[in-house]
Amino acid sequence: MTAVTTPDNAPELTPLDEVGDAWKEPSHGLRHEAVLAGARRLRARLAAASPVLAVRTLPVTTLPYPTRYAFQGAAASPAPFVTLTHRCLLVRFRQGDAVRTLLFNPTDVERARRTPFFAKLEGAVGSRVAKLLSTQFDPLEKQLERLGVAPADVDYVAFDHFHTQDLRGLLGTADGAAARFPNAKLLAPRAEWDEWGHLHPMQRAWYVADGREGVREDRVVFTDGDLLLGDGVMLVRTPGHTAGNQTLFVKTDRGVWGCSENGTAVDNWSPAHSRVAGVALTAKHQDLDVILNSNTPEGAAAQYTAMSLEKILVDPVPAAPEFVQMFPSSEVSPSLLAPGLSPSYLLQKVESGDVKSVGAQSFNAPGGFGAAAPR
């Protein structure tokens, strides 16, 4: 087994080896079995962990998205688009004696509009219609301010994958452009970072091609394996949707949650129980345990395995235990323009703990933000 190493510029992170080399198995079937065996070991570790201190959900934007991608072509609806609500998670957690802050998916909405797929869609329908189909929420900085969190308090930023992302505003650039989160490290899977520089034609529609150009790489932590960030919070490799896809797992006072864009609704992870017309029938006929968010078909088998891993690590939804607490970073939302395509159960947010009291504690506690903890 290849040892998972700690990134050189983030010695405070702990490598996780439960899944190990399973993703390198060349046989799709054997890889699936090996990854899920590792996932069960990882589940035991996560279940025994202390919970994170606080989690909040910060809405970013709504956007139209092809129905055929959202439910892998399984939804029996004439509506060409669903409406997705894209959200960011704020997580506060202990890392040794310090309290740390992570933003997961802090997408720069204005820069993301340059993503070729969405730029062409806006060009086809016109900017006025595009604005009617999307809603922008308060900037993340304003939402964080209401929670008592300043941009300088953010220690880490990470994304489930780099589709639609332009990182220059978040991290600043080598030529002096300011960073929105001046103290944050970006936790970036090396596999996807490298692919971003040499995109395949099947990938180009979903990336802002120059979205990483000029970014200060001294602010980037390149990762190659699964990582424990601190008490109750892990970033786990879930390749398939993209080469470097990763899922955030957090243990909260309401059980274990995961967050990724491998699916767009709880239905994707539990299709047998879906009330979206066509989804349960497709799953039954094809003997599928999950239905993909399928805009990137080149990695479908790996994505299926990744979603199966996610199901193992998270807990059931207490109010609807046939579904699991996999929170889509872009969740299908009810829309009059997409009748019959509402999720069978809407998650909408992950919420745990008290962010403000944690923030006050972190500044005063030994080893908190005011201490010379590793950066």
Indicate where each model-derived feature is located.
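C-terminal regulatory/interaction regions
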Residues: 2-49, 299-375
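Beta-strand-turn-beta hairpins that frame and shape the catalytic cleft
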Residues: 48-55, 92-101, 227-235, 254-257
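Conserved beta-strand hairpin/beta-sheet module of binuclear metal-dependent hydrolase folds
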Residues: 62-143, 247-263
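A short acidic (Asp/Glu
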Residues: 68, 166-171, 198-199, 247
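Active-site neighborhood of phospho(di)ester-bond hydrolases with catalytic His/Asp-centered motifs
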Residues: 103-105, 155-162, 187-189, 237-240, ...
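Active-site metal-binding motif and surrounding structural segment of the metallo-beta-lactamase
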Residues: 123-184
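Metallo-beta-lactamase
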Residues: 132-138, 143-149, 180, 185-237, ...
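Active-site/pore-lining binding-face segments in mid-to-C-terminal subdomains
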Residues: 230, 234-311
